[in-house]
Every structure is written in structure tokens, then in C-alpha cells.
Amino acid sequence: MSRFENIVLNVPHSSNCLPCNSGWSNLAELDKEIRKWTDWHTNILFNPSKELRSKIIPCSFEYSRFYVDVERLEYDPLEKIGQGIVYTDFNELHRDVDDFLREHCVRLYESYISRLACFIDKNTLLIDCHSFPSDLSDVDIC
């Protein structure tokens, strides 16, 4: 087995940041979902020391998955239930997304994917960094 020259730490869901124009209808209920589904402290847990940063590169997304989910595929099957790159439905919550908001979110998604791709080559190990809530009843762990 060959040794990797670099390690990239993908930290996609550590933020709870949600712009005020996000389109969600019930912010109080959404806040509960954000608290449950944010991968709390992964941006800190997977943050290498300065000495290691030449070989271990953290890449974190600055917004909540409820604004843009950078771990979805461009044509993700979950889009059919409102949980693609731009969530429109989650449990009982609904989000109105106009063309302007969708385009903005897709640009954020593409920017993150491009940034992540810049760090990756055939000698790179990509590690997907997550945490899970103590109640795992709703969590799908592969």
C-alpha cells in the first residue's frame, strides 16, 4: 500500500450559520433541526497544528447544511424529497427558494467543491469529518 503525501479533512457540516434571507418558513423549528444536525466542533476536532498544515489540510464549509449541503451530488436522488444541494423540505419544515436564491446557493456549492478539489490529487487521502447526535434514531451511518 502506498503512502499518501497529503491528507485533506473535509468538514462540511460544522457550521450553524444561516443567512436571514434563507427562505425557511419556521425559524424556531428550524433552529431545533440545526442544533441536532450540525456536526458540532468538528472544525476544531479536525484542525491540525500549524506544523502539520503543510501535509494535513482542513476544508470547512461556512454555512449550515440547511442553507447549502455541500455533501450532496449535483443530481442527488434526495432532491426528489427536497434534500438535495438546496433543501426545500426537511421533516415538517418548508423552504421557499426562488431562482435568485437557488443560483446563489449553487454558486456557493460549486465554490466549495472547487476549493476541495484544488487540494486533491492521486497522492491525497480525503477524510470526511462528521460527528453524530447522542440520539442516533434518525441518523444513517454507512
Outline where the language-model segments fall.
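N-terminal catalytic or cofactor-binding beta/alpha core of small enzyme domains
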Residues: 1-126, 131-142
